[in-house]
C-alpha cells in the first residue's frame, strides 16, 4: 500500500506506533508479528498481547514505555502501513547478533531489553502464548477469539502465519528493511519454520542458545548440510524453481562468483546479478556452489532496499517509491524474460516500459547494437524513429496499402529486419565501442538474450555464463568484435585462451594425430630400409619439392613391384602349361608298355622317344622365358 503525502509522519523512538489517521489496516484483527530476515536490518512489527491488551514494539530498542495509557487497548498496524520507519541498523540488532548469517538462513535476534519487555507483557514463556512457533492457522483463531480490535499474538516471533497484503496494493517501501518481508517472495526462513519445525525442537531441548521459533545459526562445518536442506525445502515448496550453478573466478585478484545458466534463454536476472557480483556490490558465502532463483531474487531485493536514497526531497521520495513499486511488480519476470522494445536510433534508446525501471533503480546501463546505418537513406526513411513493435506494425500496414510508395517502404523495412536478424549491425558495434566506458560493467541485449558486458582496452567482452564451461577456469570472457558471433575466449585477465587445455584435447583429434604420426614413422622406416640417400637432397629444398621427389620415388618402386608380380605370374602359367603337355604325351606311351612286355631293344627305343619330347619341351620353355624377360 503506497503511503500518501498526508500520512508521512516520522516515527520517533519512544513513541508507540499507533495508526495514522485514515491509514488503518483492513485486516487489523489478523495481524501477526513479522520479522525481517536477510542481510538487511531486521524490523519487528509492533503488536499488542491478546492477554494484556497493551501494545509493545519489539526492535533494537524497547518501546514499552510509550505514551499510551495503561489498560487502554491500542490497535497497532503492521509494517506495511507505517508511512516512514527510519531505524538504523545499530538500533535494530544487539551486539550479539552482529554475526552475519549463512545465506539461505535468516538470523532472528532480540535484544535483552526486548526480552524483558516481552516477559513483562506476556510475550515470553511466562505469558499466555509463549514465543514458540504456531501451526498454520492458529494466529487467525486466536485473533478471532480475542476480538477484532485487539490483534493477538501466539508469541513474539512467527513467520508461518503471514497475512499478505491485499492484491493490488504494495507495502510501503520505508517499512521494508529486508526483501524477505515481501509476500510475493517467501524467504528461506519460512521454509524452515513450516517444514523444519520438528528439527528445531531437539536443538532447543539440548540447550542451544537460540530463541524459540528462530532458525538456529549453524557453524562452518554445517554450511553444506544446511544449504542442501534449504535447497530441498525450496524444491518441495516450489517444484518449478530453477537451480543455478556458481562458478568462482579470479576477478582482479579476488575470488569472485558468477552465476552460470543451465538453459539458453532470456534470463536478465543472471545478467544483473553477475554485474553486481563483479562489482562486489553483492557477495555470496565462500565456496557456495548452487543457488536457487528464489535466493537470487532475495539478494537482488535486499540490494535494492539497501541502496535507496536517504536524504531526498519529498517529491523525489514519492517518485522513488512509485518507481520501486513498479519495479517490484515486474521483478518476477526477471527469471523468464523482460519486455524490452529497442529503437534503431541509439545503443541506449529503448521504448519506455516498466521493465526498464529495474535497470534504472539498480544504476546498471542497458545497451543494444541493433542500429540503422545513417548513410543508407532508404532504410533510414523506412525505419524512421520506430521501435521494433512499431516497425512490425508499419510493415503489415504498408503491405496492405494501395500506395506504391508505402509498399516500397514496407518492403525495405522488412528487408532490414531480415538482413539484421542477429540484432547487431556493424554500425551498432562501432557505436557500442565508442559509447561504453572503459571498465564499465553493463548488460547487453541481443537475440532476446541478456548478457553481462564490459570494455577492456577498447574492446568489448561478454561474460561466458554457459554451464558447459563451469569447470573451464580459463574461459571467462568472449570477445565481441563482429556481428557473426564467433568471438574468442579469454580468461579473467582478458588473455586469449583455447576452450580446453592441451592435456584435455578432443579424443578424436588426438587419435588422428597419433595415426598420422605412426604412418609417418612407418614410411620413414621403409625409406631407411631401402637405403635412400638423403645426402643427395639439397638442404634448401622446399617441402613441396621434397614431397614431389618422394612421390616419384614411390611411384618408381610401385611400378617395379608390379612388374615383378607380372613376371612371377607368367612363369607360373608357363610351368603349368608344360606340365600338362608332358602329362598328355606320357599317357598313350605308358599303356602299351603295361599291356605287353617287350624286349630290351624295344625298351631302349622307347626311352629315346621319351627323352626327345622332354628336350623339346625344355627348349620351348627357355624361348618363352626369354621372350617374357625382354
Curated annotation (Swiss-Prot):
Residues 508-560 are annotated as: Ubiquitin-binding domain (UBD). It holds the Pfam family MINDY_DUB. Signal peptide: none annotated. The active site is at 267 (nucleophile), 449 (proton acceptor). The record marks 543, 546-547, 550 as: Ubiquitin-binding. The modification Phosphoserine is found at residue 94. InterPro entries: MINDY, MINDY_domain. Residues 141-163, 170-191, 564-599 have a biased composition (Low complexity). Residues 606-630 have a biased composition (Basic and acidic residues). It catalyses: Thiol-dependent hydrolysis of ester, thioester, amide, peptide and isopeptide bonds formed by the C-terminal Gly of ubiquitin (a 76-residue protein attached to proteins as an intracellular targeting signal). GO terms for molecular function: cysteine-type carboxypeptidase activity; cysteine-type deubiquitinase activity; K11-linked polyubiquitin modification-dependent protein binding; K48-linked deubiquitinase activity; K48-linked polyubiquitin modification-dependent protein binding; K6-linked polyubiquitin modification-dependent protein binding; K63-linked polyubiquitin modification-dependent protein binding. One of its GO terms (biological process) is proteolysis. Residues 1-209, 564-630 are annotated as: Disordered. Its EC number is 3.4.19.12. Keywords: Hydrolase, Phosphoprotein, Protease, Thiol protease, Ubl conjugation pathway. Disulfide bonds: none annotated. It comes from the Eukaryota. Residues 24-33 have a biased composition (Polar residues). Belongs to the MINDY deubiquitinase family. FAM63 subfamily. Hydrolase that can remove 'Lys-48'-linked conjugated ubiquitin from proteins. Can also bind to polyubiquitin chains of different linkage types, including 'Lys-6', 'Lys-11', 'Lys-29', 'Lys-33' and 'Lys-63'. May play a regulatory role at the level of protein turnover. This is Ubiquitin carboxyl-terminal hydrolase MINDY-2.
